[in-house]
Amino acid sequence: MTLQVIDCLGVVLAGGLSSRMGQDKAQLKRRQNATSPSAKSAHSMLDFSQQLLADAGIKNIVISGDNHQIPDRVPHAGPVGGIYSVLSHYPEHLQPKALLILPVDLPLMTASALTELRLKGELSHKATFFSDSQKNMHHIPLYLPNNAFLNMFLMQAFHREKLLANSKNNIKKNNKNGPSVRAMLEQVPHQAIASLNNQVLFNTNTPEQWQQAQQKF
């Protein structure tokens, strides 16, 4: 069987600490669903997120996070650390051409919005993310081409990977070892596209935000 390079790999980021939520955000139950006809009610946010990517036309999907398919190579390195871990999971000759990255805490996201993000990114060959009606930038969800700019940034950002991994037991859980998504985007060709619906960008980091989102399902 010959393995083929993946054109666009779907990535669910599920490795956050969920400290403000008080429980694993990936396992929160989304009891009704008005945004994705294929997903059933009472699915976890992890299941919902995977289904969104599938409904957006993504055939290959992985989950990033210590308790999931691709564990973090660098502890507590944030979303960029998850991206680095995913790309490091694939040998050089099977590197995906691009990633469509979705965090596990966007319960109002839609497959159509993700499809638009992917298509705009594929046409431009640029990292592509949403801006809302107030011109605020939302750097995730993100369509991210896997190119030389990204590879150079990740190599420089995580060249101390082994040192950090060896000191894992000495790192406080609240410390962040990875760069921000914004810092990464500054080093790669990128564009923001206007979101047609600000609601899809509503993220849930606290129980109060989760309750607000539930009222909109």
What are the residue ranges of the model-derived segments?
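Short phosphate-binding loop-to-helix
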Residues: 66-100
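Intrinsically disordered, low-complexity terminal tails and inter-domain linkers enriched
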Residues: 31-43, 92-95, 156-176
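The conserved acidic donor/metal-binding loop of glycosyltransferases
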Residues: 103-107
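Conserved alpha/beta core of the MobA/IspD/sugar-nucleotide pyrophosphorylase nucleotidyltransferase superfamily
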Residues: 3-6, 163-217
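Alpha-helical elements of Rossmann-like donor-binding domains used by nucleotide-donor carbohydrate transfer enzymes
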Residues: 48, 82-85, 116, 212
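Conserved donor-nucleotide/metal-binding helix-loop-beta segment in metal-dependent transferases, i.e.
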Residues: 110-137
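N-terminal glycine-rich phosphate-binding loop and ensuing alpha1 helix
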Residues: 2-66
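Conserved nucleotide-sugar donor-binding
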Residues: 137-152, 207
